[in-house]
Design a protein with these regions (language model features):
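Cytoplasmic helix-loop-helix junction between adjacent transmembrane helices
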Residues: 100-138
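Structural signature of the two symmetry-related core transmembrane helices
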Residues: 70-84, 282-287
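Helix-to-loop junctions at the C-terminal end of transmembrane segments
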Residues: 53-67, 154, 266-280
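Symmetry-related core transmembrane helices of the 12-TM Major Facilitator Superfamily/SLC fold
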Residues: 161-178
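Hydrophobic core of transmembrane alpha-helices in multi-pass small-molecule transporters
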Residues: 12, 82, 92-111, 116, ...
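Central cavity-lining transmembrane alpha-helices of secondary-active solute carriers
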Residues: 42-60, 255-270
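Juxtamembrane intracellular "pre-TM" segments in multi-pass secondary transporters
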Residues: 1, 179-215, 240-245
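Helix-loop boundary and gating motifs at the non-cytosolic
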Residues: 1-51, 209-245, 252-254
Length: 287
């Protein structure tokens, strides 16, 4: 299979599985399972909890002991199993636990897929800056199409969205077997555990500009999580008003929410041009 096509499929499936449930799980829990807001917030907090430490830990494994592609495959095996389990869960406590397990498996794959893509592109003598964005954009396209598929199938308030999400995970495991061997980097022999865990990065906060950048990023992350949790739920709440109950936006809230990802897709395409022409500082200022 053509290298770029293979990486595009990998990126497409990686985010397709997330798009099938990330923005609609809140509505399913609130409307169908009757969870309260605090319980929904707790479930979504599991993504952040997992993202704090799990990518680093599995990154160490991929650097020292096991090829990144096999770590990636194992993560998706766990991810598929936990999504199948989540589809059968009906209580807040159990949902938190299962989604936490899923997040512990999924969050590291966001970094691992970049590692795999970068290695393959560099091995083929390609430029990551110019060749990777057109590949990565297929991830966002996958996210959008998954949102639309779940919405037009009438599964925004159904557990079926979780079954749909598990399917790309299974396909990704199979696709991993077709990838060439990716050697263990083994670059961390003489590094301290502080460095391996990335804790020395906190020294960057001494730089005022970096501190402002990190704080700004955290605020954007918090805003995004609120939208993921309750944006779809908010739009569905209008079905109680007869004036809006049958409107397209209420019936297909995910399609409306996908405007965010469509915007992302368009801007990803412009990154190589703007970075080369204006530099990272001006690009950040514009954004």
């Amino acid at each position: 299979m053509n290298l770029k096509l293979q990486l595009k499929i990998l990126s497409f499936l990686q985010f397709c599985l997330w798009g099938s449930w990330l923005t609609t799980l809140g509505s399913y829990m609130f409307v169908t399972l009757k969870f309260d807001g605090a319980s929904i917030g707790a479930v979504y907090s599991s993504l952040g909890i997992a993202a704090v430490f799990m990518p680093t830990l599995l990154g160490i494994v991929a650097d020292k002991w096991l090829s990144a592609k096999w770590v990636y495959a194992l993560c998706h095996v766990v991810g598929a199993i936990t999504l199948f389990m989540a589809a059968e869960v009906t209580t807040p406590g159990a949902m938190f636990f299962v989604i936490l397990l899923n997040s512990l498996a999924y969050m590291p794959t966001l970094g691992l897929i970049n590692t795999i893509s970068y290695y393959r592109l560099q091995s083929a003598g390609m430029d990551i800056v110019t060749d990777f964005p057109p590949i990565r954009i297929w991830g966002t396209i996958g996210f959008i199409l998954a949102m639309w598929g779940v919405s037009f199938s009438g599964f925004e308030l159904s557990h079926m969205q979780l079954y749909i999400g598990a399917t790309p995970s299974v396909l990704l495991v199979q696709l991993t077997f077709t990838l060439p061997h990716i050697p263990v980097a083994n670059q961390q022999k003489n590094q301290s555990w502080t460095s391996m865990l990335g804790l020395d990065a906190f020294a960057l906060f001494k730089n005022k500009r970096m501190a402002i950048f990190f704080i700004f990023s955290m605020m954007l992350g918090a805003e995004l999580q609120i939208t993921n949790m309750f944006g779809n739920t908010f739009l569905h709440s209008f079905d109680k008003d007869p004036l809006f109950a049958s409107s397209f936006i209420v019936q297909h809230a995910s399609v409306m929410m996908s405007i965010s990802q469509i915007s992302e897709t368009l801007f990803i395409l412009t990154i190589p041009f703007f970075l080369s022409r204006y530099g990272i500082n001006n690009v950040m200022l514009i954004s």
